[in-house]
Amino acid sequence: MGGCTSKPSSSVKPNPYAPKDAVLQNDDSTPAHPGKSPVRSSPAVKASPFFPFYTPSPARHRRNKSRDGGGGESKSVTSTPLRQLARAFHPPSPARHIRDVLRRRKEKKEAALPAARQQKEEEEREEVGLDKRFGFSKELQSRIELGEEIGRGHFGYTCSAKFKKGELKDQEVAVKVIPKSKMTSAISIEDVRREVKILRALSGHQNLVQFYDAFEDNANVYIVMELCGGGELLDRILARGGKYSEDDAKAVLIQILNVVAFCHLQGVVHRDLKPENFLYTSKEENSMLKVIDFGLSDFVRPDERLNDIVGSAYYVAPEVLHRSYTTEADVWSIGVIAYILLCGSRPFWARTESGIFRAVLKADPSFDEPPWPSLSFEAKDFVKRLLYKDPRKRMTASQALMHPWIAGYKKIDIPFDILIFKQIKAYLRSSSLRKAALMALSKTLTTDELLYLKAQFAHLAPNKNGLITLDSIRLALATNATEAMKESRIPDFLALLNGLQYKGMDFEEFCAASISVHQHESLDCWEQSIRHAYELFEMNGNRVIVIEELASELGVGSSIPVHTILNDWIRHTDGKLSFLGFVKLLHGVSTRQSLAKTR
């Protein structure tokens, strides 16, 4: 397992604010650079500038002595005269195969030139038609005094700067400069536009880099942000030799989880969380941590999934590689950061980028090597629950702040969890039988889980009768809303919760509605909990039900052979739901999945 111990050196410090090079390498022969820029799938994939292909060195030509082509006279009169040839056979040239290879390469290159030229012409024509006007202010020179360059990335660079006038006069800031010449496609233009929109829309969190303004001229776009002079989190990890104590790691992770939970509530997924994208405000040991670089971020609704592959290889989640993901992908990245903080090594490592991707998809992180045996059980459990490959089993950022390892560190205000919306929506659309099953399962919740749900219930401002309604949810959203929440259309999602418009929900039902069966299944106590839940269901919720009625409750169409699918869901002795049917009902196993298994 490779240690997180080095960073690419450069005469100019890598720019923490600048957008990263988005290149996806699929060739196993391409080494994975430790400081490599984020990956982004693209129809046109360029070779990495860090790893050019090497051409063979020219062979040294050996001078050979010429041979006599004539036969000459024989020393014996009885010998047969040698046959005379027009020219002698020369020894095989040691450089001939090299010349052949170079000739074939030249032919291929010449054949490819027309296609390459055509592609370049098409790109130039496309670029000519691109609208690179963003509508930003053009008064940069009158308001901002640019200083020296402090960092450089593939698509731009960052300068220190000062405000010349106004309330912020003499305030030091960082200005990210993105040349418009680098914006060669509509996608790259939209990326810049979206980054500014997200920075402008997100506000009000102490661990979020402050955005001041955006400017443009004919040559560049300028994004003015808070100047963080304390360096990257990665620098501090390296300065410590790659290992943090558990308490020091908690102090870092609490800040990361808090700001990520805030972004997720606003409907923003960062998609490139890594130590390089967290900066300290000052050199002080206990200075505040700020998340930066929203160049790959996007808006996402609670019921929406993204499909483009973006991020950095070591931190990318499995579902991103499968092209179907949402906010849980950020939580995976936090799990990788937590693993590095506690042991100094990456959980997934390989010599090539494609090898890293295979490890992310197939391998399990090791908790057997030092220092893991000496760390607390709670610390290991915390990291494991962030690195579940199934995103449905992964903790959310808000839930992670309630994990026993974190919760015991100091008093933390738990942010509202966007997962609650998804769970309530699914609950309201469930059959009465599934609601009864969820109610039985909620009776087995642990104390820690109940504390988390109590905090979430309080965020929804229950009325004097102890009930939450659609209006109270709207009020809770308005209390926590930023402009980003409007962009991600989260308020529109409330239309799917109309079941609460005329009927409130008390805390007991809220627990049943909010419980995540997949998360609960990942706990060590699952087998015991599900057995106990079934016993409670037998006493209070189970009833005699025929297959046709069960099919109706599940919304199974008449064209589906329900007896084949649901036969094992019902006990033949008394016609009630079997334990297997109870478990499947809780998981919400679709009839399509069940039908596929019977074939």
Swiss-Prot record:
<keyword id="KW-0472">Membrane</keyword>
<keyword id="KW-0449">Lipoprotein</keyword>
<feature type="binding site">
    <location>
        <begin position="150"/>
        <end position="158"/>
    </location>
    <ligand>
        <name>ATP</name>
    </ligand>
</feature>
<feature type="region of interest" description="Disordered">
    <location>
        <begin position="1"/>
        <end position="128"/>
    </location>
</feature>
<keyword id="KW-0723">Serine/threonine-protein kinase</keyword>
<feature type="binding site">
    <location>
        <position position="176"/>
    </location>
    <ligand>
        <name>ATP</name>
    </ligand>
</feature>
<keyword id="KW-0067">ATP-binding</keyword>
<keyword id="KW-0808">Transferase</keyword>
<dbReference type="GO" id="GO:0106310">
    <property type="term" value="F:protein serine kinase activity"/>
</dbReference>
<comment type="function">
    <text>May play a role in signal transduction pathways that involve calcium as a second messenger.</text>
</comment>
<dbReference type="InterPro" id="IPR050205">
    <property type="entry name" value="CDPK_Ser/Thr_kinases"/>
</dbReference>
<feature type="domain" description="EF-hand 1">
    <location>
        <begin position="448"/>
        <end position="484"/>
    </location>
</feature>
<comment type="subunit">
    <text>Binds calmodulin (CaM) in a calcium-dependent manner.</text>
</comment>
<feature type="binding site">
    <location>
        <position position="549"/>
    </location>
    <ligand>
        <name>Ca(2+) 3</name>
    </ligand>
</feature>
<comment type="similarity">
    <text>Belongs to the protein kinase superfamily. Ser/Thr protein kinase family. CDPK subfamily.</text>
</comment>
<feature type="modified residue" description="Phosphoserine">
    <location>
        <position position="312"/>
    </location>
</feature>
<feature type="domain" description="Protein kinase">
    <location>
        <begin position="144"/>
        <end position="406"/>
    </location>
</feature>
<feature type="compositionally biased region" description="Basic and acidic residues">
    <location>
        <begin position="118"/>
        <end position="128"/>
    </location>
</feature>
<keyword id="KW-0677">Repeat</keyword>
<dbReference type="Pfam" id="PF00069">
    <property type="entry name" value="Pkinase"/>
</dbReference>
<feature type="binding site">
    <location>
        <position position="574"/>
    </location>
    <ligand>
        <name>Ca(2+) 4</name>
    </ligand>
</feature>
<feature type="domain" description="EF-hand 2">
    <location>
        <begin position="485"/>
        <end position="520"/>
    </location>
</feature>
<feature type="binding site">
    <location>
        <position position="542"/>
    </location>
    <ligand>
        <name>Ca(2+) 3</name>
    </ligand>
</feature>
<dbReference type="InterPro" id="IPR017441">
    <property type="entry name" value="Protein_kinase_ATP_BS"/>
</dbReference>
<keyword id="KW-0597">Phosphoprotein</keyword>
<keyword id="KW-0175">Coiled coil</keyword>
<keyword id="KW-0547">Nucleotide-binding</keyword>
<feature type="binding site">
    <location>
        <position position="509"/>
    </location>
    <ligand>
        <name>Ca(2+) 2</name>
    </ligand>
</feature>
<feature type="compositionally biased region" description="Polar residues">
    <location>
        <begin position="1"/>
        <end position="13"/>
    </location>
</feature>
<feature type="region of interest" description="Calmodulin binding (CaMBD)">
    <location>
        <begin position="430"/>
        <end position="450"/>
    </location>
</feature>
<feature type="lipid moiety-binding region" description="N-myristoyl glycine">
    <location>
        <position position="2"/>
    </location>
</feature>
<dbReference type="GO" id="GO:0046872">
    <property type="term" value="F:metal ion binding"/>
</dbReference>
<dbReference type="GO" id="GO:0004674">
    <property type="term" value="F:protein serine/threonine kinase activity"/>
</dbReference>
<dbReference type="InterPro" id="IPR011009">
    <property type="entry name" value="Kinase-like_dom_sf"/>
</dbReference>
<feature type="active site" description="Proton acceptor">
    <location>
        <position position="272"/>
    </location>
</feature>
<dbReference type="InterPro" id="IPR000719">
    <property type="entry name" value="Prot_kinase_dom"/>
</dbReference>
<feature type="binding site">
    <location>
        <position position="540"/>
    </location>
    <ligand>
        <name>Ca(2+) 3</name>
    </ligand>
</feature>
<keyword id="KW-0479">Metal-binding</keyword>
<feature type="domain" description="EF-hand 3">
    <location>
        <begin position="521"/>
        <end position="560"/>
    </location>
</feature>
<feature type="modified residue" description="Phosphoserine">
    <location>
        <position position="578"/>
    </location>
</feature>
<feature type="coiled-coil region">
    <location>
        <begin position="99"/>
        <end position="130"/>
    </location>
</feature>
<dbReference type="GO" id="GO:0016020">
    <property type="term" value="C:membrane"/>
</dbReference>
